């Protein structure tokens, strides 16, 4: 989710100016990256807060003092680490992609809808990505992507629920479940063999 600056300030016991200086330093050192909130006038009540990511999941684990075993044992932490990992992969691929998509996130103000990552292409087309710490996500894991598809119509060119399992399969119209490994390889379609 998106953490408001006020929550970070209060938790760290620092003022806004100090937090801003630390944030600039960490960004300049390429330790964190801020991903902007996606916005369109076609949707109402979208949160405009940037989402912060630690650039490297290995550094994230070291700072938190956690091991792979402890990450796997805590579902929320695993989800956040996987989300960070996927964003890092997409950031690298988007930088060298001919299409040069913008990377965003989406969350409505009341929190009813949240999509981990949005790719926006030059013509305004949008591709949504949900990251799940599950080996076999179901249609309920695509509910926010379906909502966005229904809101945007043809501007929504597709969506994927990335997961930890090995299979590629359809979830809904223009939405599939695919293994995270498909970020760097072609997933095997069980229908093809």
Give the predicted meaning of each segment.
Residues 95-97, 122, 147-155:
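Arginine/glycine-rich "motif VI" loop of SF2 helicases in the C-terminal RecA-like domain
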Residues 132, 162-163:
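Short beta-strand/turn micro-motifs composed of small residues
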Residues 131-139:
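Short beta-strand-loop-alpha-helix junction that forms the active-site gateway
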Residues 164-193:
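Domain-level recognition of nuclease-like catalytic cores that cleave nucleotide substrates
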Residues 1-126:
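Accessory nucleic acid-recognition modules appended to NTPase machines
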Residues 59, 135, 166-168:
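Conserved nucleotide-binding/hydrolysis micro-motifs of P-loop NTPases
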Residues 140-144:
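Residues at alpha-helix caps and immediate loop-helix transition turns in enzyme cores, especially N-
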């Amino acid at each position: 989710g998106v953490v408001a600056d006020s929550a970070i300030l209060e938790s760290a016991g620092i003022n806004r100016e100090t937090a801003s200086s630390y944030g600039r330093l960490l960004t300049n050192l390429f330790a964190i990256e801020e991903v902007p909130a996606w916005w369109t006038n076609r949707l109402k009540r979208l949160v405009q807060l940037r989402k912060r990511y630690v650039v490297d999941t290995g550094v994230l684990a070291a700072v938190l003092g956690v091991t792979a075993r402890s990450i796997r044992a805590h579902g929320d932490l695993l989800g956040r680490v996987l989300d960070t990992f996927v964003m890092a992969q997409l950031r690298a691929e988007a930088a060298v992609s001919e299409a040069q998509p913008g990377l965003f996130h989406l969350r409505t103000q009341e929190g009813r809808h949240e999509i981990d990552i949005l790719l926006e292409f030059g013509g305004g087309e949008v591709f949504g990505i949900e990251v799940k710490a599950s080996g076999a996500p179901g249609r309920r894991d695509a509910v926010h992507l379906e909502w966005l598809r229904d809101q945007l119509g043809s501007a929504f060119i597709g969506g994927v629920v990335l997961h930890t399992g090995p299979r590629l399969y359809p979830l809904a119209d223009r939405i599939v479940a695919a293994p995270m490994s498909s970020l760097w390889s072609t997933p095997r379609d069980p229908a093809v063999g």
